[in-house]
């Protein structure tokens, strides 16, 4: 794909989406577009896109100039601000992760690289790959696994979840660049931009929080899934796949099939191939799931306590069973805690604080898409959810009136 001014403008627009009034983005808009915060606010009140388009035009010109300097040898890199990394503890798994904060211009170049790579990504990424990408999030994974489990012709009886150790951190930049060099050897400007962006990582791997990096790891994961689905065994002259279906969510892989021995064989093979070829490590802590039949799950519905539970695939914050889906216990505990506190707030002061309203809205999807009607009724979830939406709407109206 050739580098054009329109492509740079589209990348800048996507990078600035919902971020126009952040402090660092406003500084960048004034530096390269010559438009102040007051002018942007005035234009936003009357739905005038002129100042924003002026900013995007100025940023696109700067991006083109930096890429031209990079290609003709006048510069060694894109002259971006260093990436700021900071530790954060995952509230669910309690793992310590090194997240990254990239400057606005870094994000613009990341979106530009994605737009250039989009034809390749559309061709290479499998329909069963899910991550923090548009229309391919955790809800999409939940629906896909539900369709697999409830489709009788597939005959899925077992599942195995694998986890790539330190996926982003241990995915070397040389591996990603080698794949791109093989796939698009003639895209000189695109390879140069991707090389400079990947080199910004302080540890030699992929950044957690970068826009381009999420797509690059999914490109690497596509080779893993293709390899898994290609494993077959030959019986009486007929090739039978070892794995019926396979998918991924971020650094988690799931293998589903009819026989546990076949899935186990495929897992051993892919672990060795990933280690030897991609220099990544799949953890030895496999998670095996043996699904029950629909009749057995229906029979257990009438039992009490732990006897009522059925084995399920815990992935992407959901637990998928044969005939129903539940929420991961840790997520449900956090959601229940917030709804109980919101109920106390509503009873005490007749309104829900804004910060808690955002949390209630974010947890609504877990109640909506799972078998949790009894819990939702006990927590009065729908009433609290509507009250939270009203609080957010009222805060937005108040903020808009103050801006005028």
Show which residues each predicted segment covers:
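Short, conserved non-catalytic motifs in the polymerase core
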Residues: 44-50, 81-108, 124-136, 198-219
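Active-site-proximal segment of RNA-dependent polymerases
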Residues: 110-172
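Polymerase palm active-site segment centered on the conserved acidic dipeptide of motif C
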Residues: 245-248, 255-349
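Non-catalytic, polymerase-adjacent accessory regions of viral genome-replication enzymes
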Residues: 1-70, 399, 403-404
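An acidic intrinsically disordered interaction segment
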Residues: 61-86, 180-190
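Active-site and adjacent loop segments of nucleotide-processing enzymes
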Residues: 304-404
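Generic alpha-helical secondary structure
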Residues: 56, 60, 106, 110, ...
